[in-house]
Amino acid sequence: MTSYELSRELGGHKQDVRGVCSISNELIGSASRDGTYSVWEQINGEWTPHFYENHEGFVNCVCYVPAIDKNSRGYIFSGGQDKCGILQEVGTNSPSYYLFGHESNICSASALNSETIITGSWDSTARVWALGQCKYVLKGHQSSVWAVLALGEDIFITGSADKLIKIWNGEKLVKSILAHNDCVRSLCQIPGGFASCSNDGVIKLWTSDGEFLYELHGHTSFVYSLTYIHNQQLIASCGEDRTIRIWKGKECLQCITLPTTSVWSVSSLPNGDLVCGSSDGFVRIFTVDKVRVAPTEVLKNFEERVSQFAISSQEVGDIKKGSLPGLEILSKPGKADGDVVMVRVNNDVEAYQWSQKENEWKKIGQVVDAVGNNRKQLFEGKEYDYVFDVDVADGQAPLKLPYNATENPYQAANRFLELNQLPLSYTDEVVKFIEKNTQGHSLESKKEPNLESQSSNKIKTTIFPVSQLLFSNANVPAMCQRLRSLNNTKSNPLPAKSIDSLERALSSKKITDTEKNELLETCLSILDSWSLAERFPALDALRLLAINSSSDLAPIFLEVFSRVVKSVPSSGNFESINVMLALRGLSNVVPNITDAEGVSKLMDCLTSTVPQASSAKDFKIAFATLAMNLSILLIQLNLENTGIELLSILFSFLDDPSPDNEAFYRALMALGTLCTVPDIALAASQIYHAQSIVHGIAERFSQEMRFVDAEKQILSLF
């Protein structure tokens, strides 16, 4: 086989390119965390991007959908964080169809044609679509469906974070296979069957009916994506080890290393070229055709960037320099393409990879801080765990960036920028540099916390998880006196003894279920017949009655408060007070909810009541308290999928430009509680950049030590 070489590097996306697809030799699709998807068009040898911003949040996957109509160029499908799939006809500038139905992020897609499209989601289901209509909902996985494949007109394959592969005929499950030792990340069709890859670092080949054939080993970390190269009968794979690998049978023919941390997606063009998307925001094309190979100076620059790529010492383990070989080891050939060795060069440690094609070792990076964990480094008379060299401009000496593993990276970044009189707008970039060079994955380790793991492992801190907070304070005599005053104005008043019974019960704080049922009827009668401005005391009474409700009564209280939230707009003054009181009541109901149906209703209430900047302080506090109590319930019930959904609501609330300190503190308590689950913490970090947001809030309220402590505790969870 002629080896693949770089053809083009296409820049334009501002964040990770999570998905790529082949449309034709001249058209490529891409999806990015920057919230856009793009169609790249080759015109006169140059690639021109057409970016589209039709999603809310990041875009996670993209695939080409051939059209049945021969007059159409087909569609590009994109799916992402907003739970929506979009079909856009190639060559047009607006969506043709919106695909609604998934209850969480859409993370995978595959299509035979516009009548047979399959999507996978964090909601643990796959859906099959004909244009904009859902034909089937494939249920059975216990976690995110990260891989889908339309194998035939009604034959579908799904792979999940639950480690299973399932084969479907229509919506009927045909076979379930415990396929891998970790999350299944991608599927691709091969002659006579399909291939799968996983976080376990292994690629497996299967017949179309799910019989195992053989497996491929070579990747040193998670394998994210697969594609079949039809005109050469090869498989290409990519992953967290920065490589694309080319396979023929059981043999790895070539290993291409990229100057980036992760290669997320790979796809093959009809002419055999490969396109990939990576964590540095680039789309790259590799080719075996000498006509399409990049100019020599471009290739040289690419190889130089690969060789200078900084590899965290944690990525390769705690290296002892004295035990490493010197350059003499490079005189011995590698055993297989892609083999990696660590070499001691003076005071440095360099990584080299064996190239079968060129029959030589090629430098693929320099290990940063490749020393034992106990060593400290001096900078301006102080000891630090790390002192990095940071290049800020060509021709200038690198600047020193000191950092201790125990400190907040944002503090280190701010100190570095202020010391060197650099703009604070670079803070996020410096933090990413620190995190990349101090938080690596081991080349020998295949484990990554997946976003939908059912593990109940939690991290404990001195604050989290917090306890649920109830709204239990009330001036019962004043509340009931107000009820009597209003009741006396009614043409059809309540019996006086009903309000007397309510006052006695609330004052005693020991109420039987029978009494609560009777008092419920009194309060519900008020809600049904009194105006919004008059219902406040009744809602307040219901809030108190909801505390310590039995399993029989809790759903009733939940339904009552939910009805108020859904039926009353929160824009007017009286309206917003009604909703605020209902949110307080819901907060008191949460400790007595034990099922997923109740959780779903609580989530609906939160979603529909996210406060505006102009919302009253009490409204914001009630909302944040409900979110905090719900976060604790989700952890108790191990509902991690819903926990990840709650993150979206929390970060929307935390974006308030006119925050209230108590409300924000309770929202931070909710966030910290959720992030005691590593999978949710990973989602908070990767999707919402939680560290930056938490740091900004702590700075805003830096005069309050509780925010400083909360920041420290939350950041320790990532």
From Swiss-Prot:
Subcellular location as annotated: Nucleus; Cytoplasm
Keywords: Cytoplasm, Nucleus, Repeat, Ubl conjugation pathway, WD repeat
InterPro entries given in the database record: ARM-like (IPR011989), ARM-type_fold (IPR016024), PFU (IPR015155), PFU_sf (IPR038122), PUL_dom (IPR013535), WD40/YVTN_repeat-like_dom_sf (IPR015943), WD40_repeat_dom_sf (IPR036322), WD40_rpt (IPR001680)
SMART domains: WD40 (SM00320)
Alphabetical list of Pfam families matching this protein: PFU, PUL, WD40
Disulfide pairings: none
GO molecular function: ubiquitin binding
Ranges occupied by WD repeats: 12-50, 54-98, 101-139, 140-178, 180-217, 218-257, 259-296
Biological process, per Gene Ontology: DNA repair; proteasome-mediated ubiquitin-dependent protein catabolic process; ubiquitin recycling
Residue intervals of the PUL domain: 462-717
Domain PFU: 353-448
Predominant subcellular localization, coarse grouping: nucleus
Subunit structure comment from the entry: Interacts with cdc48.
Known function: Acts as a negative regulator of vacuole-dependent ubiquitin degradation.
Protein name as annotated: Ubiquitin homeostasis protein lub1
Gene for this chain: lub1
